[in-house]
Amino acid sequence: SRGLGDVYKRQMYNSARSCPSRANLLTGLYPHQTGLGHMDGSHPAWPKGYSGFRSNSDNVTIAEVLKDAGYFTAMSGKWHLGNKSNPILRGFQEYYGLLGGFNSFWNPAVYTRLPKDRTPRHYEEGTFYATNVITDYAIDFIDQAHQEKKPLFLYLAYNAPHFPLHAPKEVTDKYMSLYMQGWDKIRDARWKRIVDLKLMQGKPALSPRGVVPESLFEDETHPLPAWDSLTKDQQTDLARRMSIFAAMVDVMDANIGRVVDELKKNGELDNTFIMFMSDNGACAEWHEFGFDKQTGVEYHTHTGEELDQMGLPGTYHHYGTGWANVCCTPFTLYKHYAHEGGISTPCIISWGNHVKNKGGLNHQPAQFSDIMS
């Protein structure tokens, strides 16, 4: 994203899943204190900590605080804090994005513009891709704040690279030769780079190849298979899945560059505090080979024309535990778990000339609640 990153903070701890982390980030409270101790669903029999995101009668969001302080507050992207509230009711003046947790990146009908009296942007058929459009609105909001001469608080919450894995084919194709090397070689290469860059303190060691955890879809925990034990068709299918994931990150990175360029154009970049982080570790759902429909259980190996169509409109895929183990290098376990693989993700910080140690590495542990509090 064009040089963004004055400080790389290695230990920024989240709450292991989307909803709890977002509630934690926006309120500075532990997820249970906001009603999102698990996810965004609720049930009358559940205790208060699991009752769903509560109103501002007992918590306040960073957007509400900054709005009262005179900021222009806007959000573009994934809300995923349940249907008891929405961004406008919780302090954001402008919103565009996905109110739920995940959906198609190709279908504009599942995205929402709020307040309801706003006129949404128009996109010709076949040109909509969510990551690009979320950025279009983010840039609109940046420009609106600049025109109104107000300080800006923008919460830019991309749904990429969450499943379903969707990306432009030409970007996906760039990564196929890399990921055909397989998850064992790539995990080893990532570990070597971590060591060479001195990203870990002390004398760290790479954890063994991971496991597929017991779950609703797996009767018992079992080891991940070695890449070389898979058939060529399985390897090609899995490499395609990871290539789509990489393409989603690639497109997101380019769009962050667009945001940075807009701030620079408006003369606001050096005066803007930017944090980039993730709401959880890599997603291992639900077995080593991923899944192909929203049920989470259906999977088959794609070949031929079907392989080429992966990631395009009308498809639905996830990459599975094998690649999640790579994405969490060098840690153990994944999203859902309170192990490092689930809760420890990097944070990149930029703040123009206000940062003393530009390009530095910070090992001080922090947690999402620290941002609001």
Indicate residue ranges for each PLM-predicted region.
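Formylglycine-dependent sulfatase
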Residues: G5-S373
